[in-house]
UniProtKB/Swiss-Prot annotation:
Belongs to the EamA transporter family. It comes from Helicobacter pylori (strain ATCC 700392 / 26695). Its main location: membrane. The keyword Membrane applies. Residues 17-141, 183-288 form the EamA domain. PANTHER family: ACYL-MALONYL CONDENSING ENZYME-RELATED (PTHR22911), SOLUTE CARRIER FAMILY 35 MEMBER G1 (PTHR22911:SF6). The chain crosses the membrane at residues 5-25, 36-56, 76-96, 97-117, 124-144, 147-167, 181-201, 216-236, 244-264, 272-292. Keywords: Cell membrane, Membrane, Repeat, Transmembrane, Transmembrane helix, Transport. It is a multi-pass membrane protein. Disulfide bonds: none annotated. GO terms for cellular component: membrane; plasma membrane. It is found in: Cell membrane. This is Uncharacterized transporter HP_1234.
Amino acid sequence: MRNTILFGVSMILLANLCFGIMSAFVKITADYFSPMENVFYRSITMTLLLLLIYPFKPYRLKSYKQGGFKKLAFRVVVGGLAMLAFFYNIEKISLATATAFSQCAPIYTVLLSPLLLKEKLKRSTLISACIGIVGVVLISDPSVENVGPVEIFMGILSGIFVSLAYITLRDLREYYDKQAVILAFAFGMSLLGLVGMFIDIPFLSTGIHVPRKEDILWISLIGISGTLGQYFLTYAYMNAPAGIIAPIEYTRIVWGLLFGLYLGDTFLDLKSSLGVALILCSGLLIALPALLKELKKI
């Protein structure tokens, strides 16, 4: 049991490192490609890699039972919108702040679950979520960096859409193999990104920019790191309880800070640092009951 949990923890740490590397590569390419193009290149590379792996490690592509397609399509759409909003913020603001906005998903999940899943909300959980909301307000300061109304809006949207994707994943387990969900997400996002590149959308899609020689490397690395991150994430949740894995996901913010500083981001000021700290505390407090429950079983 302990070895399995240790393996799961190792997997989530590797997943967060890979996602941090992917975000750094997206920031590098953001000077040339639009967020929509980065979504497409990230997704199409991931799709090709998954298709290459499939013959060596096949899995069930058909659903276990009927009724899951609409939920899968919804997961693809909200997951894609979350990625698009996140990639926009990576271009405009510091990597740490963009990542912090995205990692607010558990806070929104707490607030949305009573409405969407009819789950009863505990007072302690609500207080934890409110702490996180205060953190969001602190990092949404227009006087800091380039965090304007659009960046704040995109940041909140990225967190909300990620939370909706997580909520949907709970139901999808009954219908599809986990690997099939990953492939469907990658393929669906490739289609959405491809169509989106031909539509002029302010801030998000500004036409098609033909990849230069040096861009091929960055595009490949974005896809490879994103695919590895997704696989490590899947294996983490397959080998260890979610209550133990979920709190560790916040190390992604640390990688966002470190890679951002390496790429030239300024260090967060006191107000933004406090906001990120509150978001971290909020997520940990939300996950704490499940964490303690799982630790007692060891």
